[in-house]
């Protein structure tokens, strides 16, 4: 089958209506769940982004290395080219591979040495991905540009890009010194989101330049959708593996105007609606190409939820009785269960029974071995050493 991983960002166990939320409705995710298996005891591998995604792609626990913590925006690539990834495995099986959206695994060889005005290597192409269009860092970290096949998308030669995580650039405004320029979102105190200003929002890290390449936060979801749909259309005649990492519901939460105010829960609730919309558009693209029945979709989150994560977006004030963590304790950054226990849905209409709920204990780290068994690939020596196949489940 074709295989798509949809990995949300900071989406909690209780954030969607198919997992018990009642203040926010997620009809597209609910439809996906009803078309397959909804797992109730599934876990990300860590309660933060970088180690979670590292383990998802490699099948190795992140704690086996000491450089897999939350990556800076100018981090060198955390997964090394000599490591075997799940994308390498799919390529060996004859699949076309792609990675779109949130990455947070670094680019280039060493931290702080990238020239963002050229192709940055090593990158996803060295990890088995034929195509990539990724956020260079995270939504709240500079550089705020898209990297398509490891080069800045819509690069503006009149505004060369410079990035620093050690000192500001002279003459460049910052959230700390120029709060009057924060026209879209203001940071919460003591979270560090008071440095470079892009799109009226201050970030972590310092940046100058970018020009026409700089993203607008309200368009990030639409860019992910457009690039995902394009990949599906280009590869509709051959098997593909596609990783889609959404920016929703990570900070800064600044959804498209079509969603603003629709949830009644502020920007965080609106971002959940935007995530559901994204899922719907991916399903729609598969249907249009006649691929839905033979496409296995795994939907999950990189870690548990966080409400106040550094911006004044009324997420706390408007939360009401919504419980992003469900009936669990903890959340993102936490060792308690809600830090890693996340939504996990598997849908493959051709093969997987519809409308099933499973309380089996599963982990994202086991997707590597599971997919290898699915496509008939033996695990290479040293590959996915912590991954066990869950195909029997």
Please provide the spans of the model-predicted regions.
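Formylglycine-dependent sulfatase
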Residues: 1-391
């Amino acid at each position: 089958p074709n295989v798509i991983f949809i990995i949300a960002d900071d989406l909690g166990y209780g954030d969607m209506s198919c997992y018990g939320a009642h203040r926010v409705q997620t009809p597209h995710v609910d439809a996906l769940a009803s078309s397959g298996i909804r797992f109730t005891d599934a876990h990300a591998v860590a309660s933060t982004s970088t180690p979670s995604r590292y383990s998802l792609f490699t099948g190795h626990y992140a704690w086996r290395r000491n450089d897999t913590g939350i990556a800076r925006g100018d981090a060198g690539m955390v997964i090394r080219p000599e490591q075997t990834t799940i994308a390498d495995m799919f390529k060996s099986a004859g699949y076309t591979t792609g990675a779109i959206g949130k990455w947070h695994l670094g680019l280039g060889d060493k931290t702080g040495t990238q020239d963002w005005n050229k192709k940055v290597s090593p990158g996803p192409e060295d990890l088995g991905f034929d195509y990539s269009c990724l956020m260079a860092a995270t939504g709240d970290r500079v550089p705020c540009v898209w990297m398509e096949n490891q080069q800045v998308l819509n690069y503006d030669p009149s505004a060369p890009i410079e990035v620093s995580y050690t000192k500001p650039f002279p003459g460049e405004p910052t959230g700390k010194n120029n709060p009057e320029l924060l026209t879209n979102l203001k940071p919460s105190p003591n979270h560090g989101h008071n440095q470079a200003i892009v799109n009226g929002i201050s970030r972590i890290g310092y940046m100058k330049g970018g020009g026409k390449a700089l993203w607008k936060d309200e368009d990030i979801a639409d860019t992910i959708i457009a690039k995902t749909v394009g990949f599906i259309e280009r590869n509709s005649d051959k098997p593909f593996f596609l990783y889609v990492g959404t920016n929703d519901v990570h900070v800064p939460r600044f959804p498209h105007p079509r969603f603003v105010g629709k949830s009644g829960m502020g920007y965080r609730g609106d971002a959940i609606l935007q995530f559901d919309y994204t899922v719907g558009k991916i399903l729609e693209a598969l249907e249009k190409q006649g691929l839905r029945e033979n496409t296995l979709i795994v939907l999950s989150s990189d870690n548990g939820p966080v409400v106040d994560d550094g911006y004044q977006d009324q997420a706390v004030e408007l939360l009401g009785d919504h419980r992003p963590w469900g009936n669990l304790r903890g959340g993102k950054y936490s060792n308690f269960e809600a830090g890693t226990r996340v939504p996990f849905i598997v849908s493959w209409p051709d093969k997987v029974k519809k409308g099933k709920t499973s309380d089996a204990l599963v982990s994202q780290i086991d997707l590597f071995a599971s997919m290898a068994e699915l496509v008939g690939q033996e695990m290479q020596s040293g590959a996915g050493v912590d991954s066990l196949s869950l195909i029997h489940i």
